[in-house]
Amino acid sequence: MKELVFYFDPISPFAYLAFERLPQVLAGCSHVAEYRPVLLAGLLQHWGQKGPAEVEPKRTWTLRHVHWLAQQQGTELDTPAVHPFNPLPLLRLALASSADMRPNRRVMQALLRHVWVGGADASDPARLAALTQEIAPVLDPAGPAVKQALREHTESAVQAGVFGVPSMACDGRLFWGLDALPMLHDAMTGGTWFEGPAWAREGQPREGVQRR
């Protein structure tokens, strides 16, 4: 059985679309999935990147693109009333949903659809209260243990080379983005390309012009 780690932050529409599509992509592949919350802003800060929403033309394109992608894969998607927003309460709620701080698929679905279905404000206090009641956390989402776990998840993701969400890890390989799902499927079902030299070769340092 394959072990898959799915790194996510609900602020990302691509994480939502990838989550919704994952069962179809991995149908027939024996696997167990761990959904691991990470703070995308922390990843971006570490790697010196800006998020798509921080570059206005890129933000516009990204939102148009994800709506088209959602239509193509038959997934309901509505841009939340406020975006970007502070995802920390949702990330912590995901961790607090179980004693081992591993949210299950039901929790993930509730969390991501809270943001990406309906077009409401994901940070609205009344909506957050209703979501918390639905998920029924067994730990305190605002407690120090949950906060520390999120920091550790984000730091360990950086150490694993995660630079964005969604990212999927399996068999020591890291796959990034919604469009990497077919590649992930190929890797998890014994695709022969992964037996060749290209994966290792393209991970080697190369010379190149450095921006000053």
Could you say what each language-model-derived stretch is?
Residues P10, Y16-V115, A198-R212:
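Structural alpha/beta surface segment adjacent to cysteine/selenocysteine redox centers
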Residues V5, L17-H31, A110-R212:
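C-terminal cap of thioredoxin/glutaredoxin-like
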Residues L4-P10:
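Asp-based phosphoryl-transfer active-site loop
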